[in-house]
């Protein structure tokens, strides 16, 4: 009886590196990259646990890095859309005479690079913070950074919504956070409380960094960018305090 119980216990030990049937993105060679990307994003939004359990190659980041690059481009495009709307609104202000298209184009490209590239870098930062937190969980199996990178990247599918003006980005952010909790609970087999707390703390740390960057960017936009890009009827001067 004791031997049978021991064998049963050994059989139920969780192996975090177990391979699944393959995600749509991993099968993009047969599905086509565009269709595979959108199908992966939709599964991430509506069946995140199933998607994460189907990862075929948890030991390499080749597929997940390409997926992350495309996700980062989406956030860069979102920043471009919102920057364009902001500059268009500025051009409609009563005291505005002209908006320099060349300067505006440069600023828009700069914003795309900062948000897209920044998102790519911040994801890696999230994985490092998250890995340190779950390493402290009692009874949690050893998780490699590569595994965490691969699993959590498939939580980013709601980024498709980021290109929707105004409402899209906050909805995407909340949805991604929910997916990250699912990643910890369903794929990494953490207790729900641990999965929630670890994902939330890591996510808040990243949002804090992003908030600081956004604040600096907004100050730049208000006090410097518009100074060069927008010509008004009122003599333009940099503010003095």
What does each of the following model-derived ranges do?
Residues 2-74:
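N-terminal juxtamembrane cytosolic/stromal segments of multi-pass membrane proteins
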Residues 7-23, 48, 54-55, 93-103, ...:
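Hydrophobic alpha-helical transmembrane segments
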Residues 53, 85-92, 135, 182-192, ...:
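Juxtamembrane transmembrane-helix termini
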Residues 78-115, 162-173, 210-241:
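Membrane-helix interface segments in multi-pass membrane proteins
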Residues 107-111, 120-212:
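Hydrophobic alpha-helical transmembrane segments and adjacent short intramembrane/lumenal linkers
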